[in-house]
Amino acid sequence: MPVPSVTVTTDNEYEDISSFSSIDSYKPEPFTGFKDSEAPEQPLLKNDTIVGKGQLEDDSNVDDQHRHSDVHSHHSSSTLKRPTSNSIEKMVTHNALEGNSETVDSLKEDGLNLNKKALPDITAPVTNSAHDAAFPEEYRLETETGLVKLKTLESLKREDSRVSSTKKEHINDHTDMHSTRSKVTTNSQGSSLEPNKLNMAVEKNKKRIEKYQKHKSEKGIKGFFHRIFD
């Protein structure tokens, strides 16, 4: 009976898989963005629905008014997706090459006077100095709000800018009060300077001084009671 032959295979006959390491085959390259032909075909999202190519062709007339005419891109301003940095760079570069960007020369060509002062601010009558009045609304603001410039107050020699009936009433009340106080003060001063009352006050003070001089040298309980009750 013949003996069947047995073929023995060793590990040396197989290729070493360690030579297929991904580290040896990897070559890093900078990402420069997709080209128009290589860009992945992704459906555009619009109004929470997926829009296919067929529907996009039907709605091309509507979408054309929203698309950027100067950018060859599949992005639309009506989509919910944000434009990538690559598309933005292409847009800026395209506009710069086509001369669609604003420069000093282009503004001059459009008729813009770069030396002309801009329109004054609405708060200019209140915040600027007195000689910078640019429009007559300043005087209306002064009349209605009382926000008068310091220069105007100095020229009027006034401390308050508000002029109204309530202000006049307040001035009258203040004048009446001042006159009343003046009368009271005058009456009190006149009554205190009468000769009889003045002599009585002098005599009273003289007696108090004499008692003080009499008892100031006394000591003990007697002197204490004299100084208090005398």
Swiss-Prot record:
Residues 1-88, 156-203 are annotated as: Disordered. Residues 63-73, 156-179 have a biased composition (Basic and acidic residues). The keyword Phosphoprotein applies. Keywords: Phosphoprotein. The modification Phosphoserine is found at residue 106. It comes from the Eukaryota. GO terms for cellular component: cytoplasm; nucleus. Residues 1-11, 79-88, 182-194 have a biased composition (Polar residues). The keyword Iron-sulfur does not apply. This is Uncharacterized protein YGR126W. The lineage of its organism: Eukaryota, Fungi, Dikarya, Ascomycota, Saccharomycotina.
